């Protein structure tokens, strides 16, 4: 497994679609995320009670994350998606030493 250097956390609310609709779309687009250069892993998130969804992305580098942020996939799947509101996209450097101790 590649070393995680950067983590991206994305959250949004659903509008105009149900959780089940979202799950269907997520299953369809997941293979597109699996092909992203520099993406080590993505955890898909769901908090149905608070209508909050999103993902935690584990990147090899901040540059790989920035390439995704400027991609057509990001624009279509997230930024310009009318069914996703209150989009939050935050990035974090990984603290290597303590993260290794805790098995990242």
Regions found by a protein language model. Give the residues of each.
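A common structural junction motif
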Residues: 75-79
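Conserved RNP beta-strands of RNA recognition motif
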Residues: 55-59
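Short S/T/G/P-rich N-terminal loop/turn motif that feeds into the first structured element of a domain
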Residues: 1-52, 62-70, 83-104
């Amino acid at each position: 497994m590649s070393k995680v250097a950067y983590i991206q956390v994305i959250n949004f609310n659903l509008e105009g679609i149900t959780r089940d609709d979202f799950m269907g779309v997520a299953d369809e687009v997941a293979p597109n995320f699996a092909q992203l250069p520099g993406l080590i892993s993505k955890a898909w998130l769901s908090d149905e009670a608070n209508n909050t969804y999103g993902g935690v992305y584990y990147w090899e580098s901040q540059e790989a994350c920035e390439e995704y942020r400027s991609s057509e996939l990001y624009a279509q799947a997230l930024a310009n998606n009318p069914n996703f509101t209150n989009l939050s996209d935050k990035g974090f450097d990984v603290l290597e030493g303590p993260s290794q101790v805790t098995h990242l």
